[in-house]
Amino acid sequence: MDNLEVWKGLYELELAGLEDTQAISEIRKKIQAQIEKTFWDDANQRWRIIGNSDLYHPTEFYPDGVAQVYPLIYEFPVKEKKKQKILYDQFTERFQWQKLNKKRTGFLWAMTGMAAAQMGDINNLVELVGNYETEYCKKRKYPLYTGEAGWICMECEKLYGLYERKIKTGFILCA
């Protein structure tokens, strides 16, 4: 999963307006190829948590479950979009991540909402943001990790974009 964070950082560097991004682009593409080669388990149609390992516990939220949606969270260009949708649907059904169950791991994992944003899952993303607002914004319960707040902000931005697209699509269909 850390490899996806590195990939995303390099991707963002490419977009940052630097003059020469050729070396960055080459490194990012190599990492992308290695992520696909090492972590995609084609036989079992899932992402591995450790390269070339059959370790997998479908009832474990972290790392096993989260690994299935981590490529979505970091906007990794997954080749098999239908397979990724199946993994996302299984993750959502199995773990109900939008409820922000802190008891599960001691951590909110608000970042899972980015997977919903990538899948266009407005309902679950709205539920996540609503649960976050209800549980953590009223009294600013400690600890409010800045990382969690940051993910919520990014997810709200994505949600805004999803609503914009939905409105534009609706108007086009009505015209």
Please tell me what each predicted stretch does.
Residues 39, 60, 72-175:
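CBM-like carbohydrate-recognition segments
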Residues 1-8, 12, 16-109, 117:
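Extended ligand-binding clefts on enzyme/binding-domain cores
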